[in-house]
Amino acid sequence: MKIKKAAVIGAGVMGAAIAAQLANAGIPVLLLDIVLPDKPDRNFLAKAGVERALKARPAAFMDNDRARLIEVGNLEDDLKKLKDVDWVLEAIIEKLDAKHDLWEKVEKVVKKTAIISSNSSGIPMHLQIEGRSEDFQRRFVGAHFFNPPRYLHLLEVIPTDKTDPQVVKDFSEFAEHTLGKGVVVANDVPGFVANRIGVYGIVRAMQHMEKYGLTPAEVDQLTGPALGRASSATFRTADLSGLDIISHVATDIGGVTPDDEDFTLTESFKNMVAGGILGDKSGSGFYKKTKDEKARPRFSTTCKPANTKTRARCACPPWTPRANLSPSATPCTPWKARKATSCAPP
């Protein structure tokens, strides 16, 4: 089958960005969200999602004119329009009851040939389709994108034991050839593949950061390009993903895998999430967005290894706890200074 038109339900950070990527591929997309009772515009959330995508940095659209391919609407007035789409993807809140309620409504209006998908980052797919018809279950397959979806190549495709293998094949080909994704077919287990590994790494990094008195920036200096990983490293990745998402995934995985890896969140992280410090989506996480849209550390660092050729590379180990560095400490000796000659802790 060919996917000529799609619908994304949920116009939050991920939903709007996925809609933008579909538009980038030339696919008309219907973007729906709930109606806010205190807003006169019933499509307020969907419109806000498109506006956010237009302002996103890095850019969500290849060309802002592509936004014209996105039709905005709401779940009360426009749900019936799902009868015209070939693929429905949900990107709503990570609560199983909410997904059950949504799929019950979607099944009543979606056409019988449409593929149905969830972008859930951790809720097992087989739990989402409980109570749905055999035909719905046959066409249901998880599609887990990563933020920002225009730039991150990976797409996890997660079938259940009810999913038609032909649906998996057709959808995977669409994702690879039309959306330009690198597809990994994952088992329908808590956290799938990437989050089972990645969120565990973030949680363990938090635990070690507090244990050894490190800062987020110091941890990122250790766990980014120095290890052959992306420059976003650990905590910039967490900010991009959304700290609330990290919290949900870690809690969900930890709750169903008590005999496996430790997914216990630190109290300081829980306090951040409870206080609305959620990463890029709230403007502040482990890093804080500045007016020029560049993320700056929210926490000071003790000794910054250079990231340009004109600065000294500090020989003072970045893992040295701040408590061990007094204001009168001997300045670090640079390894290969070109212009700078010292690297003293602040």
UniProtKB/Swiss-Prot annotation:
Molecular functions per Gene Ontology: 3-hydroxyacyl-CoA dehydrogenase activity; NAD+ binding; oxidoreductase activity
Record-level GO BP terms: catabolic process; fatty acid metabolic process
Family: Belongs to the 3-hydroxyacyl-CoA dehydrogenase family.
Enzyme kind, highest EC tier: oxidoreductase
Annotated spans, Disordered: 322-346
EC numbers, comma separated: 1.1.1.35
Pfam families: 3HCDH, 3HCDH_N
Name of the protein: Probable 3-hydroxyacyl-CoA dehydrogenase
Catalytic reaction(s) noted: a (3S)-3-hydroxyacyl-CoA + NAD(+) = a 3-oxoacyl-CoA + NADH + H(+)
Taxonomy, superkingdom: Bacteria
The entry's keywords: Fatty acid metabolism, Lipid metabolism, NAD, Oxidoreductase
Phylogenetic placement of the source organism: Bacteria, Thermotogati, Deinococcota, Deinococci, Deinococcales
Additional remarks: On the 2D-gel the determined pI of this protein is: 6.00, its MW is: 83 kDa.
Origin species: Deinococcus radiodurans (strain ATCC 13939 / DSM 20539 / JCM 16871 / CCUG 27074 / LMG 4051 / NBRC 15346 / NCIMB 9279 / VKM B-1422 / R1)
